[in-house]
Amino acid sequence: MVMNKGAPMKIDRLIGILSVLLQEEKVTAPQLAEKFEVSRRTINRDIEDLCRAGIPVVTLQGAGGGISIMNG
């Protein structure tokens, strides 16, 4: 079985993002990108992956927007 070299890092990052979202009410993609030392586009792809996995992630654009876990 061939394993993607980036897979372990991505899994660690996804878990890290989820941890941040559970601890903070709201964060922005630039904040996450800086924390995990990746691009904003990578964070956006990671958020899409979390959503596809059934994690209720909500993104709001514009002033006062950000990324959060849906309550409820």
Where are these regions (language model features)?
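Short, basic/aromatic recognition patches that contact phosphate-bearing ligands
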Residues: M1-G72
